[in-house]
Design a protein with these regions (language model features):
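Long, contiguous binding/interaction regions
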Residues: 1-56, 61-93
């Protein structure tokens, strides 16, 4: 009997996504990472951060069900945070 294929893109399947978050000056003091962890079923892990009065740049890992991670990203973008996927892992070297 052939094995049944399981799709890795199911909404509830677990995923980990590493992202760059870029905050404009007016949003730097907002606790977005805390809010994401409270509003969505995701675990946040700050991998790297640089925050000044002019800009905030954060490398953030989000772990959780795929649909929750997508919703968290959409919520961040809706609230004015620029979200980009990390293309290469320069953090580990």
């Amino acid at each position: 009997m052939p094995k049944k294929k399981v799709s890795a893109t199911k909404p509830g399947s677990p995923t980990q996504q590493r992202l760059w978050l870029m905050y404009p000056p007016k949003l730097i003091k907002q606790p977005f990472i805390w809010e994401v962890a409270r509003k969505f079923k995701v675990v946040t892990n700050i991998r790297q951060a640089s925050v000044t009065d002019e800009i905030g740049i954060v490398c953030l890992e989000l772990d959780g069900p795929r649909d929750e991670v997508k919703a968290a990203i959409k919520w961040l973008e809706k609230n004015g945070v620029n979200v980009e996927p990390v293309e290469i892992s320069v953090m580990e070297s």
